[in-house]
Swiss-Prot record:
SUPFAM superfamilies: Immunoglobulin, Protein kinase-like (PK-like). This is Mast/stem cell growth factor receptor-related protein Kit. It catalyses: L-tyrosyl-[protein] + ATP = O-phospho-L-tyrosyl-[protein] + ADP + H(+). Residues 534-954 are cytoplasmic. Expressed in a migratory stem cell population. Residues 577-912 form the Protein kinase domain. It is found in: Cell membrane. Residues 1-19 form the signal peptide. Its EC number is 2.7.10.1. One of its GO terms (molecular function) is transmembrane receptor protein tyrosine kinase activity. The keyword ATP-binding applies. ATP binds at residues 584-591, 611, 659-665, 780. It comes from Xenopus laevis.
Length: 954
């Protein structure tokens, strides 16, 4: 690189008053290239100095050497050996005596660096920026822009100067950002490196002060701690605990660019005071100061105080819910307390549960929730709690109002009529007489009783019985006597019919006839009792699906299906149903194939399944079918459950119209497909020998014939094509009546089995999201329709469980024991987790192609012991290892460790995706949104769930 010598002769003319030094040839700007040598000569009659000004600061460069010029005592010679960007600025030659000066600007051009680098600029809000975007080439037009190319902020104004660079006027907080300088010379644009402008906010209000607590109660000698948090826009804020010299720790940090946090913690390991004190935290900035006060209450000994806002004597109607609430003011922290009823501790059950909460400031609340109070549950309920220093208790006297009940209504041997009644409040008994035979006599004047007395039973809060009698000898004619027991709740009555007869002469045949009559009556009573016992032993039809209303620990409160609303939009005209063949029949009713005309749209025909009861059905069974209809309408539509299409509830017996599933139940479908199943070989199948001949044997002697019953076709059977079999609809227009389950001619493989598992998991996830427990999940209760779509159903109506070996007698019920979780078998507990266990058994059924669970193991005492000891079935031959691991997780003895159905959907979906080689799934994934409370945890500590009914529904 060639050297360029620049001689700047600064002549200071002989002092003649106000003469000012001039630059040679009047030049005030000099431009050189980077690396050039620069020489400066400053001449004057007096001693001169050379200064360097940059960014408004006077600072002499370290490498700027000076020496006398030509041995002059006044003139100076300055040399920059190798010019670089550090030397850019204004050089000022000053007469030390007169302070007159002249100056020249030096620019050092560097093509690689068009601007001087600046990493960041700190500026106070409202001020102007200085010292940025200095160009190295004075011939450039300079500007400023944001790093990302976005527009400059609103009100962003700036001025440019070739020496001073760019000055931003009146900086605002919105200007805090990243910027870059740009220069344009002859159409060529060059940019600087990026830099940041940090805007320091100016306080506009006093600081904000928060205390971690405003008050604390301690005993003498106990520790305490309180933190004062101060928030301001800048770190110049001052904060302190007044009149506190020790025990204060400080911590400061920026929460964001415009918020500064300052924490002062006041702490003591042991309160040395014997009385209460206050402490003040003070914060101050340029606007002003603010104080926050903390009160420390000091006591010598702890306490427990109980408060009840309502009356402790409470009357409530039987069947109502009641909440007893006690407010606890205590220090130190009390125990949870206990509720007792006649000195017996109350534990959480379906009839009552306890809820506690901490309201802060040493105040707590304990609530006893009494659900659907019975008349026998009146009495004294007591709450007791204690801490290390004190204890207290409070009692409630609960009176349950019950309707009157007539216990005895008879004619005594003394010729009187006796009426004994009970209830709360104690009922009043009135007697009425009317001539002839009547149902009621209350329109006649009351009779005066001969005697009336009260009988107290058990304790002072036990049942009170009132007894009243009248003398029938005072009645002169035949008629009806009515005993009426009334209180403010309701009335009850009993009627006596009698006739006044002449005294008859005793007949010699009277005694033998009486004995014969009594003997015949006794035999008849015995026969009636036997028939009644057998009737009660018969299984009753009830819907298996249960909708959970509330959960407290392990106790489930199920909603009464009769309380669910029924929307008349489901009504469908009976005359538009054309019934076909019977699809299934059981002890209580049957399912019939039918054609519905105009169900979905006008002039359409749709094959449906219709549930109906037998003509001999009792009122309880009719009510159960109506409950099933209400539950199905409450659940709503889902692809993987048998959906409700309509109903007929007026003008005849109740009919429930549901989707028709052409392939029948999954259990028999799998058995029919055994010969055509393509089974890959998996490793580590310990039970392979058990299923070695599975695909070669059709006569398996399988248990439980719960499928659609086999029947002869009424018309020629039409074999659908492959295209028909794979269509995805759940139902469609059908022109051919089918009396037996259709069959597709496609083979079955492992991917199909995984898909069945996936669809059932989706359906169960949907039921769980609706707080619905199935209680009888098995392959026999899964139906299959076109496209091999599985649908969960409840087949209890059309199944004769008395002749189904899958249902084992246990107590007075027949239960599917091999599908039940241990807690359901041994404790009669049905939860979402017990459904997960049953799902694991269903997986085993699917991958064993319809074999019965626990093969060759009868349900007896040994079976129950095996389940208690943790016995689990081995993997079916056709099950991938991953699917067997899902089965095992469903069979965890701890219900809390079983996966939820949402997790099962994800696990099986992954297996289905892997079996397809990570290609898109052929079946749509319909994840169920949990639009109300997340799935209720039946074994955890969840308190309560969202109600399923509003008050108006009840």
């Amino acid at each position: 690189m060639s050297w360029t010598y620049l001689l700047m002769l600064l002549f200071l003319l002989p002092y003649t008053g106000d003469a000012v030094p001039k630059i040679n040839d009047g030049e005030d700007r000099v431009t050189v290239n980077v690396g050039d040598k620069v020489s400066l000569e400053c001449r004057d009659a007096h001693l001169v100095t050379l200064a360097f000004q940059k960014s408004g600061l006077m600072k002499k460069p370290r490498d700027l050497k000076s020496r006398p010029l030509n041995n002059s005592e006044t003139d100076q010679f300055f040399v920059i050996i190798k010019a670089d960007l550090r030397h850019i600025g204004r050089y000022i030659c000053t007469n030390t005596e007169t302070q007159e000066n002249t100056s020249v600007s030096l620019f050092v051009k560097d093509p690689a660096r068009p601007f001087l680098d600046i990493p960041f600029i700190d500026v106070t809000e409202g001020a102007d920026t200085v010292g940025m975007c200095f160009p190295t080439d004075p011939d450039m037009d300079i500007a400023i822009e944001k790093c990302d190319g976005s527009p400059l902020p609103e009100n962003f104004t700036f001025t440019t100067d070739i020496e001073a660079g760019i000055t931003i006027k009146t900086v605002q907080l919105a200007f805090d950002s990243c910027y870059v300088c740009s220069g344009n010379k002859s159409g060529t644009v060059k940019k600087s490196s990026t830099f940041s402008i940090h805007v320091k906010p100016v306080p506009k209000k006093v600081p904000t002060v928060f205390l971690s607590k405003s008050r604390q109660l301690v005993k003498t000698g106990e520790p305490f701690e309180v933190t004062c948090a101060v928030l301001d826009v800048f770190s110049t804020v001052k904060a302190q605990w007044l009149d506190v010299k020790e025990g204060v720790t400080k911590q400061a940090n920026f929460r964001s660019s415009n918020v500064f946090s300052y924490n002062l913690t006041l702490k003591s390991d042991g309160v040395p005071y014997s009385e209460s004190r206050t402490f003040t935290c003070q914060a101050e900035n340029a606007i002003g100061q603010v104080n926050a006060t903390f009160t420390l209450d000091v006591i010598d000994v702890g306490y427990v105080n109980l408060t009840v806002l309502e009356n402790t004597t409470i009357s409530v109607n039987a069947g109502d819910n009641l909440v007893l609430k006690v407010y606890i003011d205590a220090y130190p922290h009390p125990d949870d307390g206990v509720w007792t009823y006649f000195n017996e501790t109350l534990l959480n059950t379906s009839d009552h549960y306890v809820a506690t909460k901490d309201e802060g400031n040493n105040r707590y609340v304990s609530e006893l929730h009494l659900i659907r109070l019975k008349g026998t549950e009146k009495g004294v309920y007591t709450f007791y709690t204690t801490n290390s220093d004190d204890d207290a208790s409070v009692s409630f006297n609960i009176q349950v109002k019950t309707r009157p009940e007539i216990l005895i209504a008879e004619r005594t041997s003394e010729g009187t009529l006796q009426c004994v009644a009970t209830g709360f409040p104690v009922p009043a008994i009135q007697w009425y007489f009317c001539p002839g035979s009547e149902q009621r006599c209350t329109d006649y004047p009351p009779l005066s009783p001969v005697n009336e007395k009260f009988i107290q039973e058990n304790s002072s809060l036990g049942r009170i019985v009132v007894e009243s009698t009248i003398d029938v000898n005072d009645l002169k004619k035949n008629g009806t006597v009515q005993c009426v027991a009334s209180n403010e709740v309701e009335s009850a009555y009993s009627v006596f019919s009698f006739a006044i007869k002449e005294k008859l002469r005793t007949h010699t045949l009277f005694t033998p006839l009486l004995i014969g009559f009594i003997a015949a009556a006794g035999l008849m009573c015995i026969a009636v009792a036997v028939l009644m016992y057998k009737y009660l032993q018969k299984p009753k039809y009830e819907i298996q699906w249960k909708v959970v209303e509330e959960i407290n620990g392990n106790n489930y409160v199920y909603i009464d299906p009769t309380q669910l609303p029924y929307d008349n939009k489901w009504e469908f005209p009976r005359d538009r149903l054309c019934f076909g063949k019977i699809l299934g029949a059981g002890a209580f009713g049957k399912v019939v194939e039918a054609t519905a005309y105009g169900l979905l749209k006008e002039d359409s025909r749709l094959t449906v399944a219709v549930k109906m009861l037998k003509p001999s059905a009792h009122s309880t069974e009719r009510e159960a079918l109506m409950s099933e209809l209400k539950v199905l309408s409450y659940l709503g539509h889902h692809k993987n459950i048998v959906n409700l299409l309509g109903a007929c509830t007026v003008g005849g017996p109740t009919l429930v119209i549901t989707e028709y599933c052409c392939y029948g139940d999954l259990l028999n479908y799998l058995r029919r497909k055994r010969d055509s199943f393509i089974c890959p070989k998996f490793e580590d199948n310990s039970e392979a020998a058990l299923y070695k001949n599975l695909l070669n044997t059709r006569d398996m002697g399988c248990e439980g014939m719960s499928e659609y019953i086999d029947m002869k076709p009424a018309v020629s059977y039409v074999v659908p094509t492959k295209t028909d079999k794979r269509r995805s609809g759940s139902f469609g227009d059908q022109d051919v009546s089918v009396s037996i389950p259709e069959e597709d001619d496609l083979a079955l493989d492992t991917e199909d089995l995984i898909n069945f598992s996936y669809q059932v998991a989706q359906g169960m996830n949907f039921l769980a999201s609706k707080n619905c427990i199935h209680r009888d999940l098995a392959a026999r209760n899964i139906l299959l329709t076109h496209g091999r779509i599985t649908k969960i159903c409840d087949f209890g109506l059309a199944r004769d469980i008395r002749n189904d070996s899958n249902y084992v007698v246990k107590g007075n019920a027949r239960l599917p024991v091999k599908w039940m979780a241990p807690e359901s078998i041994f404790h009669c507990v049905y939860t979402f987790e017990s459904d997960v266990w049953s799902y694991g058994i269903l997986l085993w059924e699917i991958f064993s192609l319809g074999s019965s669970p626990y093969p060759r193991i009868p349900v007896d005492s040994k079976f129950y012991k095996m389940i208690k000891d943790g016995y689990r079935m081995m993997s079916p031959e056709c099950a991938p290892l991953e699917m067997y691991e899902i089965m095992r997780s469903c069979w965890n003895s701890d219900p809390l460790k079983r996966p939820t159905f949402k997790q099962i959907v994800q696990m099986v979906e992954q297996q289905l995706s892997d079996s397809k080689g990570n290609t898109p799934l052929p079946y749509p994934v319909s994840h169920v949104p949990l639009d109300h409370a997340v799935r209720i945890n039946s074994v955890g500590s969840s308190t309560s769930s969202q109600p399923l009914l509003t008050n108006s529904d009840r």
